Amino acid sequence: MKFCFDRFVVGLWSSARDHNIDAVLSCITGHGNRHKLAFVWAQEECEDSGFYCLEKEEKPIFLKRLEDLWGKKYPITLPWKNGQYSASNTLLIDTEPHVSLLNPVDSAIFPQPYKKPNPRDTFLGQTGELRSFLEGVAEVDDVPTYVKENRIGQPPITPSHPDWKYYEKIVHHFGKK
């Protein structure tokens, strides 16, 4: 995380409920580092799609609309000027591609979920694939172009996705094409 805090403005946006986030934060940032995050958003700042996950039918799909971040929908929690962040300089990282259904395609990456213990998993390490990818992101002015040219993790959900017929219903529900 130090690598990220040194190079980026970092926020945490979880689809978990607010009262469950503190334990996750301690694991991710280390004890006492919450203040280094520009914002911490929970399920309340997500959009409830009204649909459920294909893999876990009891789990609702919550969407993370980057427009809410860029437009400062929740201004009290965002310490920057309106318009300072946009599609060109924002990257959403989430293990669930469906959270980004309403965002521009190349505005997010979706690493595989971490499965412990796996001593051969170096994805998050100092020489890992994510670190290398983020080093590239830190050097560019146009994040979506970099994401498009340097695919990493799971593919985004687009019309070529095998489950598109299901996810298309969510997209249309919110008036996107």
Where is each model-derived feature located?
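Substrate-recognition element of Asp-dependent hydrolases with the DxDx(T/V) motif
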Residues: M1-C27, Q43
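C-terminal cap/substrate-recognition subdomain and adjoining C-terminal extension
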Residues: D22-K177
